[in-house]
Amino acid sequence: VHVQLPRTTDQLTVLLCVSGEQPGFVLAYLNASQNCVHLLGVPAVLTVPFADEQAALAQCYAAAGPARCREALMQVLALPEDTRYLAFSSDVLERIASRYGPIRIGFSGALTEDELARYGRSRAVQGISAGDAHAFLCQLQADAVLSPQRTAAARAAAWDAFFRQNAELLPT
């Protein structure tokens, strides 16, 4: 069987969108030659150009969907022209992720000890189901006291934990 080694051209940037009352966004950059995935949590309140005005990314998503969000982000961030998007409902994402079991995750890099305690969590790495992770991220996003950057960092931490464990179960 002929095996090709990864090349520098084997790269992909994807905007991952989780729909709902409080949509969530993560940019994933897949780089085969470096054998890595880089994740960037994008705050839903990030201001982007929309309809000749400025609007929050979440408002852009609600009004025009993921393709328009990708276009708006390309005007704000230096994203590649071939950036793709993938949108999930929270139910579909939970169903897909739950097949891999609970993820082991630590939010200490994204949230302070006080912020974690406010939600009954600690700095310790803990097992959490896909449904509980989604509910926790929605709680964070609804918290007006918590900064959008911290919420985005927590979302990226959840995606990162998912990609890092049980890699043998992920489709190839």
Describe the function of each predicted region.
Residues 1, 33, 45, 72-76:
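Terminal domain-initiation and capping elements
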Residues 10-12, 21-26, 36-38, 81-84, ...:
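Envelope-exposed proteins and targeting segments
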Residues 19-21, 30-34, 44-47, 90-93, ...:
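Solvent-exposed coil/turn segments that connect beta secondary-structure elements
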Residues 35-65, 109-120:
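Flexible, solvent-exposed short loops/turns enriched in glycine
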Residues 98-171:
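Flexible, polar/acidic helix-loop-strand segments at domain edges
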